[in-house]
């Protein structure tokens, strides 16, 4: 049995007099989940039981607790990784999963992005500026309306047009007909502009449905899809990424706030580890509550390339506006896709003109 370990950091709110016992409790809970006195196998005690590697007082009753967990307990299963690092401990409402030092063995197992930032840029033949994107919405709009909207947005020169994450396989717009129609709408826009805008359908459902939808997207000539890892599950995402090597995967953060996992780890780190080529997240200053510091750490984690995995594209979203283009890109930098949805849609019949204004603002950003 190997004794290779990786370090997991938790933020624990506790009294100073209790923190050592709390840390030891997490180490046991996230490994063998039983009284150590009941274990008589020396290999289990030495190689499997979690170890407390350090405790730091970070103020205001909060402690950073570092636990060493056995790499062998993860195997090759994405779900088991989550189970081992936060399974039962997630049931304690005073603990946050803050960071995971992913060892090379697990990085190789899960693989990270198959394409990453550079491949996305290559597909668009685009370098030297940030990328642009928007979303097809609202749900409830019939297929023809979504397809027309997709065409008008594409005529504005966007790099990516994605489904809103609320679009699924619904009676008023079935997945197969919607994706075919929206892909055709984007293609018409591309013929008008000459710019290779990508359409990103949202995949939903169980694994069989996800596979069918990914296959349909592939058959339509699409090379990007979106899914919500916290909805479909990490194992399903892991399977799709492996089975669809030509597809670039955009990860949506829906339900990401329910797990008490630090956003910079969950969205910027774990989504990337599971194969997301681009990670969508709610940026500061929009309609969600992430701070600038959290957003910066998330983007840094997504763009890492020092761990033998490719860099994923950060996609700040969630109430962004055209007027904030310079501010947002000054903050995140060039290797970013700025996603603006509702603010563009406010233009209604002038959506193409407003989209052109957005794409010009991004193109002009690096010109000073």
Regions found by a protein language model. Give the residues of each.
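N-terminal capping/small domains of soluble enzymes
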Residues: 1-154
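Structured C-terminal cap/extension of enzyme domains
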Residues: 1-9, 13-17, 22-24, 300-305, ...
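Active-site mouth loops of central-metabolism enzymes
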Residues: 10-17, 130-147, 197-209, 253-263, ...
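Alpha-helix-loop-beta-strand connector modules within alpha/beta enzyme cores
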Residues: 30-31, 45-49, 175-201, 234-255, ...
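Active-site-adjacent beta->alpha loops and helix N-cap segments on the catalytic face
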Residues: 113-123, 167-189, 207-210, 229-245, ...
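Gly-rich Lys/Arg/Thr-decorated short loops/hinges at beta-loop-alpha junctions or inter-strand turns
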Residues: 129-133, 160-165
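Catalytic domains of carbohydrate-active enzymes, especially glycoside hydrolases
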Residues: 148-164, 221
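Catalytic alpha/beta core domains of metabolic enzymes, predominantly
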Residues: 212-215, 220-340
């Amino acid at each position: 049995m190997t004794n290779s370990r990786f370090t997991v950091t938790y933020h624990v709110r506790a009294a100073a007099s209790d923190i050592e016992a709390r840390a030891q409790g997490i180490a046991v809970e996230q490994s063998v989940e039983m009284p150590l006195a009941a274990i008589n196998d020396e290999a289990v005690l030495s190689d499997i039981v979690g170890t407390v590697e350090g405790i730091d007082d970070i103020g205001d009753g909060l402690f950073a607790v570092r636990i060493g967990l056995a790499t062998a307990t993860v195997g090759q299963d994405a779900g088991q990784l989550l189970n081992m690092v936060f399974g039962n401990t997630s049931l304690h409402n005073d603990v946050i999963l803050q960071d995971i030092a992913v060892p090379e063995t697990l990085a190789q197992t899960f693989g990270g992005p198959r394409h990453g930032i550079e491949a996305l840029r290559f597909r668009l033949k685009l370098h030297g500026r940030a990328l642009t994107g928007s979303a097809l919405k609202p749900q409830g709009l019939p297929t023809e309306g979504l397809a027309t909207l997709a065409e008008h947005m594409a005529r504005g020169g966007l790099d990516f047009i994605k489904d809103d994450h609320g679009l699924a396989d619904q009676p008023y717009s079935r997945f197969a007909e919607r994706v075919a129609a929206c892909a055709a709408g984007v293609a018409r826009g591309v013929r008008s502009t000459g710019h290779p805008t990508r359409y990103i359908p949202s995949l939903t459902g169980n694994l069989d449905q996800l596979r069918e939808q990914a296959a349909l997207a592939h058959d339509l000539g699409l090379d990007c899809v979106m899914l919500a890892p916290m909805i479909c599950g990490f194992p399903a995402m892991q399977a799709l990424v492996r089975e669809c090597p030509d597809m670039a995967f955009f990860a949506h953060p829906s339900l990401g706030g329910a797990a008490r996992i630090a956003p910079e780890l969950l969205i910027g780190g774990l989504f990337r580890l599971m194969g997301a080529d681009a990670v969508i997240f709610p940026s500061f200053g929009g309609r969600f509550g992430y701070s600038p510091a959290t957003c910066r750490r998330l983007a840094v984690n997504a763009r890492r390339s020092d761990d033998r995995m490719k860099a994923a594209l950060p996609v700040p979203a969630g109430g962004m506006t055209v007027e904030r283009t310079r501010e947002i890109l000054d903050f995140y930098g060039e290797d970013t896709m700025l996603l603006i949805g509702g603010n563009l849609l406010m233009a209604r019949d002038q959506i193409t003109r407003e989209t052109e204004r957005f794409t010009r603002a991004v193109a002009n950003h690096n010109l000073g």
